[in-house]
């Protein structure tokens, strides 16, 4: 047995091997040690190999999905090795014969289909990278085998990471030579364990057509459209990996669909991370934009919403069509609510279909399809006759074209209460199959039939204590007390009828030909009933898989309806407006709000969000958008203001209403954000280096249709260095990139740039000082700030009072120019607790005569009236100076 294990493991060295042993999957050697640590299960041993104990651990077959989920989440890949025969068959080949086993599938992060292993709200993409040898031409193909989605797009080295980040695959396969390519290696290093090298033959574009024709069972690929060599390489790699992992099974994949270049808003990886579109910087969905806007009621709808958010459009017409769909449901609240009530009960049609096609589905997957199709019919009835916009009309047309015969057949065939596993039976509705009903009656009514036979025998023999019983050894038998046995074996006639089976201390057991025949019929009835049900299951699955294309289309149509209705609910509940998205260079937001922060303020503090305008539209006579130079205090809301405008652009171009009173946005083709500070120590890059690399990427790529938000460029180095870099960056944005931009800074000297840069506008975050306290108004106004109020923020943060006072003193000296040029440079980079600068806090500036009066007072000896008189006297002294 161990030799068999070693041979199978050698063929799947990059996977943990789940080796079937009866009711367990067992792991040995290094696999056992890895799995025991990852799963928290006991590591034991079984036998020896080369004189050493063999480490072993195992998991029950019935709970395997739970353990697979943990391993996949940790990035492991698992080869599932099953027993291909039963022990009896193995013994026929000899008493020492080892049971045949083979790997039936590879479970990898990008190829899972089990409901337990998948997040219903997230797509699960496998991606392949194709490259033409000796060329810069690259392409990406991505598949979700759990839903059948298959897409392909061309890319280039400079935007490869951005395109991969947009799709966010769970697994990226690349040819081994590409994996070791020095130019692409940094990209793969950033992606980590997601990247899996595979044999180059998988990506052979020359044999791609033959591989695809075989996979789809077609003679020609003419109906698929034309693809470049790099695209064919990526497509072939993806299909080859699916064949490798799924073995004999084939998922119902759609034909590859090209994702046209320029169709989506370009957002680089750091911008996606900074804006926290789908996940926060801590990788949590909670607190992300997606979480804030998701009002969908189906898994497919949630996945489509995420896809649209991650790939906003750049075509104003298609954007308008999506907005029309949202407006339609906003204007039809009653229809919308009824539709959403239907959709709430819709199971995941695409994923159920995929499991059935891969022979991993059960009766409940058929039930999910049946329920989904019924909901689709109900949704179609709701929308029928309505004057709906084009996207909704197209969805309705798809739902109306569903195969009615399949819907009816599933409804007639499936029981209301379905078991999880088909081997349990009981999933075919009574009345569907006459023979099945007969077998079930015999199986289920066996007790009644046996009881009737027992009554007949009691009446015939006169033995009132006679019982017909059952055990696993004898089957059914007749039992009488020993003193009554003579009635059953006392005569030759009785002996011929009642066949002796067993003698007990106080009883004897018999059988009859009639009882044996009945037992055989009962046993056969159960087996026959299950066989009939399994045959019905296979027929139904065959019909479903044959109709996979219209079923997938219906699932997508329901997802479109869910997203449109959900965005209407969002717009109504959060008071969002419909944006105007056109081909201009405008960017005019009135009363804009941050969609995530607004909800958090309301939920946690019960406070409203302060709305602000933003106008980056070209001024009269200008051919390029404006740049707002934003100054103001720490904690004033600069970063929030920057992000909210970027998020409004993303929401508008994904086809959603936006958090504002009004919004007019000329299509943004590239969105860049440099907000926040982080380092990259693994690659030897400091916070400032990361900042400069990201800023360089923006300045090298932004064009006139870009929207750029930059926050505190240059803060990671010495003051004058940082100011110089920020100054030059603004000039470059203005003169070379000519893009719409928001640039926040604490370098107040930069406000003078508005005198020489015509499209630069000074704006500031308003504050109010009251009795020595700073009140942050979070309002954006025209003009420039002259202070950053950093010391006030430090005090609010809880810095020791001596530190705060010392900071005030240093600031006062710097502002008054008391220190020389050299000292000023030293202070610029001075550590907070430098011993050289440690001084006593500044003395109080209270007048001497006031101090004398206060010192002379003895509060313990004063009456209330005297104390009041002294208080008035002290007040006069202060007023008179």
UniProtKB/Swiss-Prot annotation:
UniProt key word DNA-binding: yes
CDD domains linked to this entry: ABC_MutS1
Pfam families associated with the record: MutS_I, MutS_II, MutS_III, MutS_IV, MutS_V
Stored InterPro entries: DNA_mismatch_repair_MutS (IPR005748), DNA_mismatch_repair_MutS-lik_N (IPR007695), DNA_mismatch_repair_MutS/MSH (IPR017261), DNA_mismatch_repair_MutS_C (IPR000432), DNA_mismatch_repair_MutS_clamp (IPR007861), DNA_mismatch_repair_MutS_core (IPR007696), DNA_mismatch_repair_MutS_N (IPR016151), DNA_mismatch_repair_MutS_sf (IPR036187)
Keyword ATP-binding: yes
Keywords: ATP-binding, DNA damage, DNA repair, DNA-binding, Nucleotide-binding
Lineage top rank: taxon: Bacteria
GO molecular function: ATP binding; ATP-dependent DNA damage sensor activity; damaged DNA binding; mismatched DNA binding
Gene Ontology biological-process annotations: mismatch repair
Record: residues binding ATP: 632-639
A GO CC annotation given for this chain: cytosol
Role this protein plays: This protein is involved in the repair of mismatches in DNA. It is possible that it carries out the mismatch recognition step. This protein has a weak ATPase activity.
Family: Belongs to the DNA mismatch repair MutS family.
Descriptive protein name: DNA mismatch repair protein MutS
Source species of the chain: Chelativorans sp. (strain BNC1)
């Amino acid at each position: 047995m161990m030799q068999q294990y070693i041979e199978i493991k050698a063929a799947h060295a990059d996977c943990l091997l789940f080796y079937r042993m009866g009711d367990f999957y067992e792991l040995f050697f290094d696999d056992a040690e890895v799995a025991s640590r990852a799963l928290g299960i006991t590591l034991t041993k079984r036998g020896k190999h080369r004189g050493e104990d063999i480490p072993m651990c195992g998991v029950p077959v019935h709970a395997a999905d739970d353990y697979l989920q943990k391993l996949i989440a940790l990035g492991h890949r698992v080869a599932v090795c099953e027993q291909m025969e039963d022990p009896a068959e193995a013994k026929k080949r000899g008493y020492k014969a080892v049971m045949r086993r083979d790997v039936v599938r590879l479970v990898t992060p990008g190829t899972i289909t089990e409901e337990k292993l998948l997040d219903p709200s997230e797509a699960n993409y496998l991606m392949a990278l194709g490259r033409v040898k000796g060329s810069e031409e690259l392409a990406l193909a991505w598949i979700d085998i759990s839903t059948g989605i298959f897409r392909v797009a061309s890319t280039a080295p400079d935007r490869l990471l951005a395109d991969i980040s947009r799709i966010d695959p769970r697994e990226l396969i690349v040819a081994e030579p590409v994996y070791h390519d020095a130019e692409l290696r940094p990209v793969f290093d950033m992606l980590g364990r997601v990247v899996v090298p595979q044999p180059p033959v998988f990506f052979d574009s020359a044999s791609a057509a033959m591989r695809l024709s075989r996979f789809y069972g077609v003679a020609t690929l003419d109906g698929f459209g034309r693809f470049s060599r790099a695209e064919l390489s990526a497509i072939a790699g993806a299909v080859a990996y699916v064949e490798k992992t799924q073995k004999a099974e084939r998922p119902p994949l759609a034909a590859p669909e090209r994702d046209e270049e320029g169709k989506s808003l370009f957002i680089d990886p750091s911008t996606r991370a900074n804006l926290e579109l789908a996940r926060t910087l801590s990788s949590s969905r909670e607190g992300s934009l997606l979480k804030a806007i998701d009002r969908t009621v189906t898994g497919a709808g949630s996945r489509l919403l995420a896809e649209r958010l991650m790939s906003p459009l750049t075509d104003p017409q298609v954007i308008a069509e999506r907005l029309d769909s949202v407006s339609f449901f906003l204007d039809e609240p009653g229809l919308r609510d009824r539709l959403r009530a239907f959709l709430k009960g819709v199971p995941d049609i695409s994923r159920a279909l995929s499991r059935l096609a891969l022979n991993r589905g059960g009766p409940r997957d058929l039930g999910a399809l049946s329920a989904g199709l019924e909901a689709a019919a109900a949704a179609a009835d709701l929308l029928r006759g309505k004057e709906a916009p084009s996207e909704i009309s197209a969805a309705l047309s798809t739902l109306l074209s569903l195969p009615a015969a399949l819907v009816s057949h599933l409804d007639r065939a499936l029981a209301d209460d379905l078991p999880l596993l088909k081997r349990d039976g009981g999933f075919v509705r009574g009345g569907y199959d006459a023979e099945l009903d007969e077998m079930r009656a015999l199986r289920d009514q066996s007790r009644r039939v046996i009881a009737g036979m027992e009554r007949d025998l009691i009446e015939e023999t006169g033995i009132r204590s006679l019982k017909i019983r059952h055990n696993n050894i004898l089957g059914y038998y007749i039992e009488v007390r020993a003193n009554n046995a003579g009635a059953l074996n006392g005569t030759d006639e009785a002996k011929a009828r009642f066949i002796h089976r067993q003698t007990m201390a106080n009883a004897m057991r018999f059988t009859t030909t009639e009882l044996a025949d009945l037992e055989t019929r009962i046993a056969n009835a159960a087996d026959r009933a299950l066989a009939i049900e399994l045959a019905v299951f296979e027929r139904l699955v065959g019909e479903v898989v044959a109709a996979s294309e219209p079923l997938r289309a219906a699932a997508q149509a329901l997802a479109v309806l869910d997203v449109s209705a959900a965005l209407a609910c969002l717009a109504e509940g959060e008071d969002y407006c419909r944006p105007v998205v056109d081909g201009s260079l405008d960017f005019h937001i009135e009363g804009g709000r941050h969609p995530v922060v607004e909800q958090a303020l309301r939920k946690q503090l019960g406070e409203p969000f302060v709305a602000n305008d933003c106008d980056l539209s070209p001024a009269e006579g200008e051919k390029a958008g404006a740049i707002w130079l934003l100054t103001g205090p720490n904690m004033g809301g600069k970063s929030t203001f920057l992000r909210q405008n970027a998020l409004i652009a993303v929401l508008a171009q994904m086809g959603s209403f936006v958090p504002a009173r009004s919004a007019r946005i000329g299509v943004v083709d590239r969105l860049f954000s440099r907000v926040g500070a982080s380092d990259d120590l693994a690659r030897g890059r400091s916070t400032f280096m990361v900042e400069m690399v990201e800023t360089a990427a923006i300045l090298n790529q932004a064009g006139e249709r870009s929207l750029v938000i930059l926050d505190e460029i240059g803060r990671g180095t010495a003051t004058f260095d940082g100011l110089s870099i920020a100054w030059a960056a603004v000039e470059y944005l203005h003169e070379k990139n000519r893009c719409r931009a928001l640039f926040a800074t604490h370098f107040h000297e930069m406000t003078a740039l508005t005198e020489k840069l015509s499209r630069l506008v000074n704006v500031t975050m308003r504050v109010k000082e009251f009795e020595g306290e700073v009140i942050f108004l979070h309002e954006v106004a025209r003009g420039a700030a002259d202070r950053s109020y950093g010391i006030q923020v430090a005090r609010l943060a809880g810095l020791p009072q001596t530190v705060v006072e010392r900071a005030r003193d240093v600031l006062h000296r710097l502002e008054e120019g008391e220190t020389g040029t050299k000292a000023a440079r030293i202070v610029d980079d001075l550590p907070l607790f430098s011993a050289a600068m440690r001084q006593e806090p500044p003395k109080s500036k209270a007048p001497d005569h006031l101090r004398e009066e206060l010192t002379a007072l003895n509060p313990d000896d004063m009456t209330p009236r005297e104390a009041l008189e002294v208080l008035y006297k002290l007040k006069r002294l202060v007023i008179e100076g």
